[in-house]
Amino acid sequence: MSIDTQAIIKKYQSKTGDTGSSNVQIALLTARIKHLTEHFKTHKKDHHSRRGLLHLVSQRKKLLIYLKDANTASYSNLIIHLGLRK
């Protein structure tokens, strides 16, 4: 299972060439988190990667807080599309 970053960027970008907006970054982090979660189902003792997962979750949380303050409508829409909790 690999992550199709170009498809995620195209889906969540606000304009052509937009790869760094909060929406795109959060969507990419969510895909990486889901990928690592599947990895841990078979590799239970991979503690080194688990530390990286916690870092990704923390980074996504910070971006979600920023997006919620900056653009509430975009935040609500993104939460629904990605299936995240508030």
Swiss-Prot record:
Belongs to the universal ribosomal protein uS15 family. The gene is rpsO. This is Small ribosomal subunit protein uS15. One of its GO terms (molecular function) is structural constituent of ribosome. Part of the 30S ribosomal subunit. Forms a bridge to the 50S subunit in the 70S ribosome, contacting the 23S rRNA. NCBIfam families: S15_bact. SUPFAM superfamilies: S15/NS1 RNA-binding domain. One of its GO terms (biological process) is translation.
